[in-house]
Amino acid sequence: MTRGRCAMLAALLWGCAAPVSPCGTGPVPVDLRGSWHYEGTQSSPSTATLSGTLRITSQPGQDFYGDLSVTETDVGSGSARDLSGAVTGCALDAASVDFGALFTVEAAARRHLGTVKMDVTMDSITNGTWVESGPSGPIASGTFKSARQSGP
């Protein structure tokens, strides 16, 4: 099984549970506060691209809070819709994050599982998978990446 398929399987299995928050009051393992450029793809049920801004406004310990605003564009039809909502998550350690984005037009949160990497200029890059689950299982899924635009 490829690394990507393993990550997607993990996201699908974990997607049925609520995001891990509150996750702890320990020290901040990685400072995520700031504004992030968010890019994503949706692979099911239809193909779409997502582009926008993830803002982490508060991080008391491992928990973090903010909002996500994106434009989702259907690859087939070209139709676009704006999505925005609250973000609640957890910095599991210095290299892993788990967060949910609850868009105001959707009934279920999109759960994101990602890795955080710091490059030589200390700009954080996050990559991972997301899944939106409903009562009968996964509704939509895809991948995402974020690069910090500004921060503390």
Q: Where are the regions that the model predicts?
A:
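Tryptophan-anchored aromatic micro-motifs
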Residues: P27-L50, T126-W130
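N-terminal glycine/threonine-rich, aromatic-flanked beta-hairpin/loop signature
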Residues: S46-C90
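Sec-dependent bacterial lipoprotein signal peptides
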Residues: M1-A18
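Amphipathic hydrophobic-ligand
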Residues: S46-S51, S77-S84, A108-K117, P138-K145
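N-terminal helix-cap/turn-to-beta initiation motif at the start of protein domains
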Residues: S21-H37, T57-G61, M122, Q149-P152
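Acidic, glycine-rich flexible loop segments
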Residues: A91-S124, T129-G134
